[in-house]
Amino acid sequence: MSETPAAFDRRMLEALVCPVTHATLEYDAGAQELVSKGAKLAFPIRNGIPVMLVDEARPLDD
C-alpha cells in the first residue's frame, strides 16, 4: 500500500512569514513550495511541513 504525502495546512500561512523579509508567503500547491516574492525564494514543503531555511530554499527566476 502506497502512502500519499501529508497535505500542507493552508492555515499555517496566517502564522508563517519569510525568514528574510518577514513578509507574507504565497502557497504554490503544484510545486509544494511557499514563495517569497520579496526575497525571490521558494521554500520547499516536505511531508506537509514547510522547510523555512534559507539554505534549503530555491532561488526564483527574475
From Swiss-Prot:
HAMAP family: UPF0434. It comes from the Bacteria. Pfam families: Trm112p. One of its GO terms (cellular component) is cytosol. It comes from Ruegeria pomeroyi (strain ATCC 700808 / DSM 15171 / DSS-3). InterPro entries: Trm112-like. This is UPF0434 protein SPO3421. Belongs to the UPF0434 family.
